[in-house]
Protein backbone atom coordinates (compact mmCIF):
# COMPACT_ATOMS: atom_id res chain seq x y z
CA UNK A 1 0.00 0.00 0.00
CA UNK A 2 1.56 3.32 -1.02
CA UNK A 3 1.98 6.07 1.59
CA UNK A 4 -0.83 8.16 0.07
CA UNK A 5 -3.03 5.07 0.31
CA UNK A 6 -2.33 4.45 4.00
CA UNK A 7 -5.66 3.90 5.73
CA UNK A 8 -7.22 6.61 7.84
CA UNK A 9 -7.89 5.09 11.26
CA UNK A 10 -11.49 5.67 12.39
CA UNK A 11 -11.62 3.41 15.43
CA UNK A 12 -10.78 0.03 16.81
CA UNK A 13 -12.41 -3.28 17.55
CA UNK A 14 -13.09 -3.91 21.20
CA UNK A 15 -13.96 -6.99 23.19
CA UNK A 16 -16.28 -9.77 22.10
CA UNK A 17 -20.01 -9.62 22.63
CA UNK A 18 -21.78 -12.96 22.87
CA UNK A 19 -20.83 -16.24 21.21
CA UNK A 20 -21.60 -15.45 17.56
CA UNK A 21 -18.57 -13.27 16.83
CA UNK A 22 -19.96 -9.80 17.48
CA UNK A 23 -17.45 -7.16 18.62
CA UNK A 24 -17.72 -3.91 20.53
CA UNK A 25 -16.69 -0.90 18.45
CA UNK A 26 -14.70 2.11 19.62
CA UNK A 27 -15.24 4.92 17.11
CA UNK A 28 -13.03 8.00 16.76
CA UNK A 29 -15.63 9.72 14.56
CA UNK A 30 -17.64 12.69 15.87
CA UNK A 31 -20.63 10.44 16.47
CA UNK A 32 -20.41 6.72 17.17
CA UNK A 33 -22.75 6.01 14.25
CA UNK A 34 -20.47 7.93 11.88
CA UNK A 35 -18.06 5.02 11.58
CA UNK A 36 -20.83 2.96 9.97
CA UNK A 37 -21.21 5.51 7.14
CA UNK A 38 -18.08 3.99 5.58
CA UNK A 39 -17.90 0.67 3.80
CA UNK A 40 -15.90 -1.41 3.41
CA UNK A 41 -13.68 -1.14 6.45
CA UNK A 42 -10.05 -2.11 6.56
CA UNK A 43 -8.95 -4.06 9.63
CA UNK A 44 -5.30 -4.15 10.66
CA UNK A 45 -4.71 -7.72 11.76
CA UNK A 46 -1.19 -8.99 12.47
CA UNK A 47 0.28 -5.85 10.90
CA UNK A 48 -1.61 -6.25 7.60
CA UNK A 49 -4.67 -4.33 6.44
CA UNK A 50 -7.51 -6.40 5.00
CA UNK A 51 -10.98 -5.50 3.79
CA UNK A 52 -14.04 -6.44 5.83
CA UNK A 53 -17.73 -5.59 5.57
CA UNK A 54 -20.09 -4.80 8.43
CA UNK A 55 -23.13 -7.04 8.18
CA UNK A 56 -25.09 -5.26 10.89
CA UNK A 57 -24.61 -3.16 14.00
CA UNK A 58 -26.68 -2.05 16.98
CA UNK A 59 -26.56 -0.36 20.34
CA UNK A 60 -26.05 -2.76 23.21
CA UNK A 61 -26.64 -0.72 26.34
CA UNK A 62 -24.17 2.17 26.11
CA UNK A 63 -21.89 0.25 23.76
CA UNK A 64 -22.10 -0.29 20.01
CA UNK A 65 -21.56 -3.80 18.69
CA UNK A 66 -21.15 -5.06 15.13
CA UNK A 67 -21.24 -8.29 13.19
CA UNK A 68 -18.46 -8.52 10.62
CA UNK A 69 -18.42 -10.66 7.50
CA UNK A 70 -16.51 -13.90 8.12
CA UNK A 71 -16.48 -13.52 11.91
CA UNK A 72 -18.98 -16.06 13.22
CA UNK A 73 -17.43 -17.36 16.44
CA UNK A 74 -16.31 -15.85 19.70
CA UNK A 75 -12.85 -17.34 19.16
CA UNK A 76 -12.43 -15.57 15.82
CA UNK A 77 -13.71 -12.31 17.31
CA UNK A 78 -11.19 -12.57 20.16
CA UNK A 79 -8.40 -12.64 17.56
CA UNK A 80 -9.59 -9.24 16.30
CA UNK A 81 -9.85 -7.50 19.69
CA UNK A 82 -7.89 -4.20 19.63
CA UNK A 83 -7.37 -4.27 15.85
CA UNK A 84 -7.58 -0.83 14.21
CA UNK A 85 -10.46 0.04 11.88
CA UNK A 86 -9.54 2.16 8.87
CA UNK A 87 -10.74 3.32 5.48
CA UNK A 88 -8.92 4.44 2.35
CA UNK A 89 -8.43 8.23 2.12
CA UNK A 90 -10.60 8.44 -1.02
CA UNK A 91 -13.56 7.12 1.00
CA UNK A 92 -13.56 10.31 3.07
CA UNK A 93 -15.92 13.10 2.14
CA UNK A 94 -14.46 15.82 -0.09
CA UNK A 95 -14.09 19.12 1.73
CA UNK A 96 -14.44 22.71 0.52
CA UNK A 97 -11.17 24.34 -0.51
CA UNK A 98 -10.70 26.21 2.78
CA UNK A 99 -11.30 23.15 4.99
CA UNK A 100 -9.11 20.18 5.86
CA UNK A 101 -8.94 17.10 8.01
CA UNK A 102 -6.79 17.00 11.13
CA UNK A 103 -4.64 14.31 9.52
CA UNK A 104 -3.71 16.86 6.83
CA UNK A 105 -2.13 19.10 9.50
CA UNK A 106 0.13 16.43 10.99
CA UNK A 107 3.65 17.02 9.71
CA UNK A 108 3.06 20.67 8.75
CA UNK A 109 5.76 23.22 9.61
CA UNK A 110 4.57 25.90 12.01
CA UNK A 111 6.00 29.35 11.24
CA UNK A 112 5.19 32.47 13.24
CA UNK A 113 4.70 35.99 11.88
CA UNK A 114 8.38 36.87 12.43
CA UNK A 115 9.41 33.91 10.27
CA UNK A 116 10.57 31.74 13.17
CA UNK A 117 10.20 28.00 12.49
CA UNK A 118 8.50 26.71 15.64
CA UNK A 119 8.57 23.04 14.63
CA UNK A 120 6.30 20.39 13.15
CA UNK A 121 2.71 19.51 14.10
CA UNK A 122 3.00 16.17 15.88
CA UNK A 123 -0.61 15.76 16.98
CA UNK A 124 -3.82 17.65 17.63
CA UNK A 125 -5.72 17.57 20.90
CA UNK A 126 -9.42 18.30 21.22
CA UNK A 127 -10.21 20.37 24.29
CA UNK A 128 -13.48 21.76 25.55
CA UNK A 129 -12.92 25.24 24.17
CA UNK A 130 -10.76 24.74 21.05
CA UNK A 131 -8.39 22.28 19.41
CA UNK A 132 -4.69 22.57 20.23
CA UNK A 133 -1.73 21.87 17.94
CA UNK A 134 1.07 19.98 19.69
CA UNK A 135 4.15 21.22 17.85
CA UNK A 136 7.37 19.24 18.20
CA UNK A 137 10.14 21.84 18.31
CA UNK A 138 13.24 21.60 16.16
CA UNK A 139 16.25 19.84 17.75
CA UNK A 140 18.20 23.11 18.14
CA UNK A 141 15.31 25.33 19.17
CA UNK A 142 16.58 28.83 20.08
CA UNK A 143 14.25 28.96 23.08
CA UNK A 144 15.08 25.49 24.41
CA UNK A 145 11.58 24.21 23.79
CA UNK A 146 10.86 20.53 23.14
CA UNK A 147 7.16 21.00 22.42
CA UNK A 148 4.74 23.89 22.04
CA UNK A 149 0.99 24.01 22.41
CA UNK A 150 -0.68 26.40 19.97
CA UNK A 151 -4.46 26.93 20.20
CA UNK A 152 -6.09 26.22 16.85
CA UNK A 153 -8.16 29.41 16.67
CA UNK A 154 -8.37 30.61 13.05
CA UNK A 155 -8.11 34.37 12.64
CA UNK A 156 -6.67 34.83 16.12
CA UNK A 157 -3.66 32.50 16.40
CA UNK A 158 -3.91 30.54 13.14
CA UNK A 159 -3.47 32.99 10.28
CA UNK A 160 -3.02 30.68 7.29
CA UNK A 161 -3.04 26.95 6.61
CA UNK A 162 -1.32 25.73 3.44
CA UNK A 163 -2.04 22.00 3.33
CA UNK A 164 -0.32 21.55 -0.06
CA UNK A 165 2.81 23.40 1.10
CA UNK A 166 2.64 21.71 4.54
CA UNK A 167 2.89 25.06 6.40
CA UNK A 168 0.83 26.81 9.05
CA UNK A 169 1.34 30.53 9.74
CA UNK A 170 0.64 31.46 13.36
CA UNK A 171 0.57 34.57 15.51
CA UNK A 172 2.27 32.98 18.51
CA UNK A 173 5.29 33.85 20.64
CA UNK A 174 7.92 31.10 20.22
CA UNK A 175 9.01 31.56 23.84
CA UNK A 176 5.53 30.81 25.18
Curated annotation (Swiss-Prot):
- Gene Ontology BP terms: maturation of SSU-rRNA
A GO cellular component term found in this entry reads:
cytosol
Q: Which UniProt keywords apply?
A: Chaperone, Cytoplasm, Ribosome biogenesis, rRNA processing
Gene Ontology molecular function, alphabetical: ribosome binding
Q: Which domain of life is it from?
A: Bacteria
Cellular localization per UniProt: Cytoplasm
What's written under domain? The PRC barrel domain binds ribosomal protein uS19.
The function of this protein is: An accessory protein needed during the final step in the assembly of 30S ribosomal subunit, possibly for assembly of the head region. Essential for efficient processing of 16S rRNA. May be needed both before and after RbfA during the maturation of 16S rRNA. It has affinity for free ribosomal 30S subunits but not for 70S ribosomes.
* Family designation: Belongs to the RimM family.
UniProt name for this protein? Ribosome maturation factor RimM
Gene that this polypeptide is encoded by: rimM
Amino acid sequence: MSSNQQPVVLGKLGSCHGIKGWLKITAYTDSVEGIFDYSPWLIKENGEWREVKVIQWRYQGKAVVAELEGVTTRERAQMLTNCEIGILPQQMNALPEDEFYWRDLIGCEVINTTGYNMGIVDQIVETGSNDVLLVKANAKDSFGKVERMVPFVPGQFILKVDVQGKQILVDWDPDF
